[in-house]
């Protein structure tokens, strides 16, 4: 039974800023707040008067063809189809087999790499009071304020997509003292980088490897609105700002990576032009404009995206005036009401992270988004296809950020497809292209093969793995339905898909203890262990985030499938296997699709309790992974979990016509703790959006739709038609 929350006891909070009364330390991913424009990522930290910006560039990687001659992206030198046939024969005979002979070479795989730190040192700052730093999620601007005996200081930092630079603006109520700016690269050998300066800028150029072959070149400039004196021996620019109360610094960066040069025609080099001219141009261009113009254009761009969707939840704990680190520290998963203000704040932060790390001209966000302070990021800061990469996109389309997903499709076209065509030919003797679980930015595709298959990160190498069968089912349906929209002219391909679909094993088998089976193998092989709390829910990918089980099999309305999913989730535990945030938000979304409000909300609360750091970023808490390592997919997956509590919106399969009615359910798992909340701008499949609100029990009672097809039936969880 839902508990009653009196809305009159609290007001709806805007929940639009993260703030702290303490400066962030060098432990940036646990304490600092993030900014970005897709290409550049920034984490401001450091004490007043010695503020630093930790900088990243989305393309800066070590490894790959820049550092390894003859780099092959994990592919073999010659065809492996005979070995593949032998492995398959072994599996058909024994049920399982050894596919190690097919594994790709990981030499030169590399890692996402920190760009630099920029220090802005202000002379004479001591006896600081009234310190506050905040990130406004409505504007994407990070503001630090503090007072000294000389006056009040304010610094604003933001990363502009229109200008392709980040801006640091310093203001003081008194005239400024000397300000010194300089770069350093503390995670790399000093022989690999060089800090220089001129009268109006500080600069750092570096390379990831001296060679041969010479590694990737990177370049970053911080250009000042007030000229100064360059110390060429240190690369420090000393700015005498005593006649001014403000200073603007524009930061730009680039590399010689070129995503369009990863084809056979370019020998998969990914080698582009030296970034020097580009970096000089964008920083000069930005500084030629007024800071107010740069700010206005940034806010228009950022806020236009952020304001496309609004989630309002009640501030039942009076949390609005409490800093983020305290809210996180005091949060308890076992407190059933949670803290709706914080839960909404983290939802908004997830959208901010996506806006800041996924743009039309950038790579998609990797496992660290675009923020890593180290030389070797955890898990290389790469892309994991089994769940993590797709989790990054769970909240994009429904919350009005669909245009930003172009980054991942560009990455697939430029990075996966060219080398993946070689993988398909060498490993499978087939046409088309293929990629496997772990990818870098250099077209690495060759690790584990699809068939033979495995269930991600556990179990045997076998055939007919549930994870893959459910995905293939969904891919086939998508191809059939998308062909007309895309203007597909390959009639042979479509005929093959349509002929194969009825014969396809679709990954729905219920086991002896009532679970969705993870492998097609008979139970006598004893791989289906009840109580296996592995982090992945691979056999439920067709329940969420997919819909082969939940929609194509009508599982959302089928008691037998619902029971099997429920049994599987209970067996899998609450997500403490490695105590990662992403395993919990996935469970939350699955429970929400079962209309199980209690468990969906608990998993959300457990994520905050166990995995959200003082910065609002998701950190590992233990297990067999690096303790405290930052991994961004839980921040993005959090969006998907909350959206699953707010809506069930799934496509029909290809047997249905355009005239068939599709049902959308609003509020399948809204907790009573969110009483009186509302949503504006939730985008639905097929176009259009819906606004809705709910009562003190979490039951949606009001809704209005804009641009939604008449064939879409919108109901609440009790089946009441709303629109």
UniProtKB/Swiss-Prot annotation:
* Main function: Alpha-fucosidase involved in degradation of fucosylated xyloglucans. Hydrolyzes alpha-1,2-linked fucose.
Gene3D superfamilies (alphabetical) = 1.50.10.10, putative glycoside hydrolase family protein from bacillus halodurans (2.70.98.50)
Glyco sites are at 77, 98, 117, 171, 194, 243, 334, 558, 566, 595
Q: Which GO terms describe its molecular function?
A: alpha-L-fucosidase activity
One GO cellular component term of this record is: extracellular region
UniProt similarity note: Belongs to the glycosyl hydrolase 95 family.
On whether Glycoprotein is a keyword of this UniProt record, the answer is yes
- What reaction does this enzyme carry out catalytically? an alpha-L-fucoside + H2O = L-fucose + an alcohol
Q: What EC number(s) does its UniProt record assign?
A: 3.2.1.51
Signal peptide residue numbers: 1-15
Would you tell me the protein name for this molecule? Probable alpha-fucosidase A
Keywords, comma-separated and alphabetical: Carbohydrate metabolism, Glycoprotein, Glycosidase, Hydrolase, Polysaccharide degradation, Secreted, Signal
Compartments where located:
Secreted
Q: Does the keyword Transcription regulation apply?
A: no
Gene that encodes the chain = afcA
Set out the biological process GO terms recorded for this chain's protein. Answer: polysaccharide catabolic process
């Amino acid at each position: 039974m839902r508990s009653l929350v009196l809305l009159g006891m609290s007001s709806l909070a805007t929940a639009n800023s993260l703030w702290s009364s303490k400066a962030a330390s060098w432990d940036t991913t646990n304490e600092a707040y993030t900014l970005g424009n897709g290409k550049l990522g920034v984490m401001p930290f450091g004490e007043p008067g010695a503020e630093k910006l930790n900088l990243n560039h989305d393309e800066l990687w070590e490894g790959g063809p820049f550092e390894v001659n003859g780099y092959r992206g994990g592919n073999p030198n010659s065809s492996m189809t005979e070995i593949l046939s032998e492995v398959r024969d072994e599996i058909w005979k024994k049920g399982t087999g050894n596919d190690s002979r097919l594994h790709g070479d990981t030499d030169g795989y590399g890692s996402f790499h920190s760009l630099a730190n920029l220090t802005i040192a202000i002379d004479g700052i001591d006896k600081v009071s009234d310190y506050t730093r905040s990130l406004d999620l409505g504007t994407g601007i990070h503001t630090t304020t503090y007072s000294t005996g000389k006056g009040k200081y304010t610094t604003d930092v933001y990363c502009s997509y229109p200008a392709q630079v980040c801006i640091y603006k310093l203001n003081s109520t008194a005239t400024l003292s000397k300000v010194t700016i300089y770069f350093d690269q503390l995670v790399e050998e000093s022989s690999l980088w060089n800090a220089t300066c001129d009268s109006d800028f500080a600069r750092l150029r570096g390379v990831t490897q001296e060679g041969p072959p010479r590694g990737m070149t990177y370049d970053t400039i911080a250009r000042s609105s007030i000229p100064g004196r360059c110390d060429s021996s240190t690369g420090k620019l000393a700015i005498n700002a005593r006649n001014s109360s403000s200073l603007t610094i524009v930061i730009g960066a680039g590399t010689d990576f070129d995503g369009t040069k990863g084809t056979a025609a370019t020998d998969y080099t990914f080698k582009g032009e030296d970034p020097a001219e580009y970096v000089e141009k964008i920083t000069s261009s930005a500084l030629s404009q007024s800071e107010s113009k740069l700010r206005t254009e940034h806010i228009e761009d950022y806020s236009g995206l952020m304001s496309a969707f609004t989630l309002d939840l009640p501030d039942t704990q009076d949390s609005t005036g409490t800093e983020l680190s305290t809210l996180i520290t005091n949060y308890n998963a076992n407190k059933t009401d949670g803290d709706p203000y914080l839960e909404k704040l983290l939802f908004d932060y997830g959208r901010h992270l996506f806006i800041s790390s996924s743009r039309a001209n950038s790579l998609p966000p990797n496992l660290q988004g675009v923020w890593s302070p180290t030389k070797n990021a955890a898990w290389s800061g790469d892309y994991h296809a089994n769940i993590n990469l797709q989790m990054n996109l769970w909240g994009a389309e429904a919350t009005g950020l669909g245009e930003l997903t172009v980054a991942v499709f560009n990455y697939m076209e430029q990075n996966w497809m060219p080398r993946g065509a070689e993988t398909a030919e060498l490993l499978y003797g087939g046409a088309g292209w293929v990629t496997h679980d772990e990818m870098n930015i250099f077209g690495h595709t060759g690790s584990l093969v699809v068939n033979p298959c495995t269930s991600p990160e556990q179990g045997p190498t076998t055939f007919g793995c549930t994870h893959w069968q459910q995905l293939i089912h969904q891919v086939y349906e998508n191809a059939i339905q998308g062909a007309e929209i895309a203007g597909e002219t390959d009639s042979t391909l479509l005929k093959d898909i349509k002929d194969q679909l009825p014969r396809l094993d679709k990954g729905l088998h219920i086991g002896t203890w009532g679970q969705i089976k993870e492998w097609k193998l008979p139970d006598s092989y004893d791989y289906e262990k009840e109580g296996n709390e592995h982090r992945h829910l691979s056999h439920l990918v067709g329940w969420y985030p997919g819909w082969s089980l939940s929609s194509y099999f009508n599982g959302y309305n089928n008691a037998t499938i619902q029971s099997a999913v429920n049994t599987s989730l209970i067996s899998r535990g609450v997500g403490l296997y490695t105590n990662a945030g992403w395993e919990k938000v996935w469970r939350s979304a699955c429970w929400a699709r079962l209309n199980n409000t209690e468990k969906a909300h608990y998993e959300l609360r457990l994520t905050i309790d166990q995995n959200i750091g003082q910065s609002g970023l998701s950190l590992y808490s233990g297990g067999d992974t690096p303790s405290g390592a930052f991994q961004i997919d839980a921040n993005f997956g959090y969006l998907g979990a909350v959206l699953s509590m707010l809506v069930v919106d799934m496509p029909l399969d290809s047997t249905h016509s355009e005239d068939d009615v599709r049902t959308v359910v609003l509020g399948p798992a809204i907790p009573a703790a969110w009483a009186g909340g509302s949503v504006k701008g939730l985008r639905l499949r097929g176009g259009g959006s819906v606004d809705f609100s709910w009562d003190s029990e979490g039951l949606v009672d009001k809704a209005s739709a804009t641009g939604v097809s008449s064939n879409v039936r919108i109901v609440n969880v009790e089946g009441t038609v709303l629109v």
